[in-house]
From Swiss-Prot:
Binds the lower part of the 30S subunit head. Binds mRNA in the 70S ribosome, positioning it for translation. This is Small ribosomal subunit protein uS3. Belongs to the universal ribosomal protein uS3 family. The keyword Ribosomal protein applies. InterPro entries: KH_dom (IPR004087), KH_dom-like_a/b (IPR015946), KH_dom_type_2 (IPR004044), KH_sf_prok-type (IPR009019), Ribosomal_S3_C_sf (IPR036419), Ribosomal_uS3_bac-typ (IPR005704), Ribosomal_uS3_C (IPR001351), Ribosomal_uS3_CS (IPR018280). Residues 39-107 form the KH type-2 domain.
Length: 229
């Protein structure tokens, strides 16, 4: 039976950057990795209502720089920047170093797989029909400019006794093309019938790094000469 590789993992270093960018000695590596995990857990829990897509962590010169990518920067910053100061102090406490927090706004949340998956999960918790939630997400992404999108939900859909999976796709989603810019993410919806998993793939185009795509024109077949009678 065929298995699927993680769309983001296979593209790391090709079209996808790492979300933790730092180097460390062997003795410090495990501590840094653990503190990265703790920082992400804290910020994800604290900023549930802020539509956070990803958290990028850098460690320049015995300090830590955290960039929060969010569709609602006002919720993260708070009144006169008070909330950011609270976050910065807590991150510094977790890591034991000086911390800096940057906010990056996501201009098109309809094209961010994590935000789309979270949105569908929240709609399912509000008892919106899963087909309607999937179709709405797909239509919004295609309207904004996605070249393709696929959405899959799995679990006791509509309160059914037997769990199943359903998916909806529009456009093209070339998972085997490494230069394809595919954003992939998952989310969970905790309903009264159990947990429903949500997966989203969004194809935004191909990353060619200045190369011009070559389109081969079909070769014309030579005309056959009529047989001599």
């Amino acid at each position: 039976m065929g298995q699927k590789v993680h769309p983001n993992g296979i593209r790391l270093g090709i079209t996808k950057p790492w979300i933790s960018t730092w180097y460390a000695d062997k003795s410090d590596y495990a501590n840094n990795l653990n503190s990265d995990w703790e920082v992400r857990q804290y910020l994800t829990e604290k900023l549930k209502a802020a539509s956070v897509s990803k958290i990028v962590i850098e460690r320049p010169a015995k300090s830590i720089r955290v960039t929060i990518h969010t569709a609602r920067p006002g919720v993260v910053i708070g009144k006169k920047g008070e909330d950011v100061e609270v976050l910065r102090a807590q991150v510094a406490k977790i890591t034991g170093t000086t911390a800096q927090i940057n906010i990056a706004e996501i201009r098109k949340p309809e094209l961010d797989a994590k935000l789309v998956a979270d949105s569908i999960a929240q709609q399912l918790e509000r008892r919106v029909m899963f087909r309607r939630a999937m179709k709405r997400a797909v239509q919004n992404a295609m309207r904004i400019g996605a070249q393709g999108i696929k959405v899959e939900v799995s679990g006791r859909l509509g309160g059914a006794e037997i769990a199943r999976s359903e998916w909806y796709r529009e456009g093209r989603v070339p998972l085997h093309t490494l230069r394809a810019d595919i954003d992939y993410s998952t989310s969970e919806s905790h309903t009264q019938y159990g947990v429903i998993g949500v997966k989203v793939w969004i194809f935004k185009g191909e990353v060619l790094d200045g190369l011009v795509p070559q389109i081969e024109e079909p070769k014309q077949q030579p005309k056959r000469k009529p047989r001599a009678k």
